[in-house]
Each structure stands twice: as C-alpha cells, then as structure tokens.
Amino acid sequence: KMPPVSKRIKYKVEHVLPLLDEYYPTMDKCYLHYTKPYELLIATILSAQCTDDRVNIVTETLFKKYPTLESFAQADLAEMEQDIRTTGFFRNKAKNIILCTRALLERFNGELPSDIESLTSLAGVGRKTANVVRTHIFHIPSIVVDTHVKRISNKLGFTDSQDPVKIEFELMRIFPEEYWGRYNTQIIAHGRTICKARNPQCEKCFLSEYCDQ
C-alpha cells in the first residue's frame, strides 16, 4: 500500500500544474508528425534516443516511401535499416517496425489497440510509446515519462525514482487526471526552453520556488 501523499507534495502540485497551464496553455499537441494513427506508433519507436526534430525529418520521407501499413509490414529489413539509419539504433528499430506492423495486421485487423497490454505486446513498444499513443490517438489520460519528465519531476520533488514505470505511477497518484495528458508536452517545452539539462536558466524559471535543486 502506498503512503498518503504528503502536504508538501500536494501544495507543490496545486501550484505547479496551474503555472504550467498558464505558461504553456496549448500543450496537448504532439511533437512528432503523423497523419495516420500507426504512423505515430512508428515515429515514437524511432524517437528512442533520438530528437523529435530528427525523427520528423526521417518520417517525412519514410511515410511517403511506405504509404500504408502493409508496405511497412512487407518492407525489406536491410532497406528499412538504411531508411531510418540517422535515428540511431537503426537495426533494432527497423526490425521492430516490421514486426510491429505485421502484428497490427495479423492480430489487430490493421487497427491500433488502445489498451496498454495489447500495445506493449507489440515489438519495440514499451509503456512510454504506448502512453504516447493512448494520449494522442485515443485521448486516454496517460503520463508519458521521457528524459525531460524524469529529470524535472525529480527536481520538483514529485518523485525521487529513476525508474520510468515507478515515476509514471507516482505522478498518476499525485496529479489530478485532467493534467496527465498535457504534463509531458508542457515539461518538454519547459525542458527545452528554460530547465535545460546542461544549462538551466533558473533565474528565468517560474517554478524556481517549488524546485528542490
């Protein structure tokens, strides 16, 4: 059984989340470009250890070359590796994209499933990727834990864990559900502009009084 949420954490949550809404009001958008649901799944697989900007450059060509789910499922592995090479870890990613798109056709009639168990049963799909899909395709409240969310949630004292799954459940426990979906994109925006990993602009930060570091 989880211990009750402390007064201090409750106080921070009540102040920090509305401030994020104030400074990043339209942040339920997705940084990865896609037009079809399965394209977001592929883009998210590619985004592991890679910037969203780089993924968007690659998928602009990739989604034209493979315009259907079937074309991905039938792709040549060596060719796919070259197509996505610049995203890094391209051998694993190419294999996972082909296996994943085949599974969608064979097991899910070419449709993306919405439940976390089915999504994470697909090759290359962990909870983070599944939650991106659940948030942006199905509008199911989910917390996506990426490097920005991990780092900044630790700084704010919302969690002291380094484990993305633990962080996800801790944040779900302390945040009202209506904030779950947009917390990730707001924190990414904050992490890119103000709370940068290497050179945080603490003097400009509207959250500095709630920050533990």
List where the protein language model places each region:
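Catalytic cores of DNA base-excision repair glycosylases
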Residues: 4-213
